[in-house]
Amino acid sequence: MHEYGYLSLLPPLIAIFFAIRTKQVFVSLLFGIWLGWMIIENFNPLTGTLSTVQALVDVYKDPGNTRTIMFCALVGALIIFIQRSGGVAGFIHWVSGILHHYEQRKSGSNRIIVQLLAWLTGLLIFVESSISVLTVGALYRPMFDKLGISREKLAYIADSSSAPSSILIPFNGWGAFIMTLLAAQGFSDPFATMLKSMAYNFYPIIALLIVPVVILWGKDIGPMAKAEKRVKEEGKLLADGAQPMISDELTEVEMAPNVTPKAYNMAIPILIMVFMMPIMLAYTGWGEALKERPDASVFDQFIFAIGQGSGSTAVLIAVLSSILFSMVFYRVQNIMGFKEMIELTLKGISGMIPLALLMMLAFAIGDVCKNHLHTGTYVASVVQDWLSPGLVPFLIFLVGCFIAFSTGTSWGTFGIMIPIAVPMAEQLDANIYLTIAAALGGGVFGDHCSPISDTSILSSMASATDHIEHVRTQLPYALMAGGAAALIYLLIGLMT
């Protein structure tokens, strides 16, 4: 394996710096990819550029990448369907009726209730982080707009309740991946090991708790405070010059004529998508369950299969199932005809082209950093030689944060850090569960803060907000949770 040293840090850091500084995220990511391949090709501009083009093409060699990008595009069709059907208008009317009751008792409580409902929804859909952020965005964006709550706030709530709940309630693909990594380190019962470490996974716990505190407190900080002030005083849901992750054609679709708004036209397709997620996870992991747990009960095999299933396949089939169901459901109600459905599907997909492009660039820069420049491995190797037992969890957390921030992938960070953290903790006699939790929490923290994270990108898309504005407004809250988690790891590490 070729070692690039500190040069491996430049592509992700420069790409992220320019993305935040210039708000030109597409150009910044493309430049980061090009710089990475320039380093690999010894700064030969011709071969570096050709390798960059090939790297973008190679994104689609990975079936998981392709399925994820297809999922993002098809989400546009689902969004436009539920708006055209009157489902969004019906949901707004239904929630408004509930809020009216509370508004009569205490003025202003409706804003709090809607935000708490959004947080709770994201928390409960722990089976898959992508489905979680999509559901929260699709359900609550219209209500946030109506109540004058910024889309940046919605993106923050969706993002901060998705990955943290998915990793803390690990009966999903997250848990399966973590158990696979732990099993590779020689743990005889990786499930029990994972559960014991969850009590020490402080970042996702704190990140989840900060959200309701911020909502109930009613005060925001940093860029989020400015965003909320903008909406309140100027009535602008987006900042001037903002570039929402989805086209206005999707968020401003008018309801079909002569249609009565019905909340179930929105709720049922969303529930179909959420329901199909664990079903498809179990289906794609069933063969492995029969192989690994042949004597277990059907229920135990089902739970194990969910953990072994393909997340990208599950989300793609889930959204396809929801779209196909919606077509039949709306046709039976005479809301729209087949020709209009096809036109709306194509219109919805076209509205997601910016998101699909951004996902492609994010996958490409993640690949060049992880698999070619080995950025994460370099960062981990820099600190592992001078660790003391008490500092192991603290520094493992910080390194995990940096790797995830630089590569935009929490799972990739887990794959790098667990094989390093476990032997290190065993060799230095550090708390093994605390160290595992630190590696996992660092991955989630960096993933939250990074503009090249797929979860952050999907949160921006689902909330129809500018991606860089989402990253900027979420960062102070993530830093608070991350700082608190780091301090706890340091104190516990030094006391044990």
Q: Where are the model-predicted features located?
A:
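Alpha-helical transmembrane segments and their helix-start/interface "positive-inside/aromatic belt" motifs
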Residues: 9-29, 115-118, 152-160, 164-167, ...
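Hydrophobic core segments of alpha-helical transmembrane domains in multi-pass membrane transport
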Residues: 10-21, 31-39, 71-80, 118-125, ...
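Membrane-core helix-loop-helix motifs of multi-pass transport proteins
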Residues: 143-237, 253-265, 456-488, 493-496
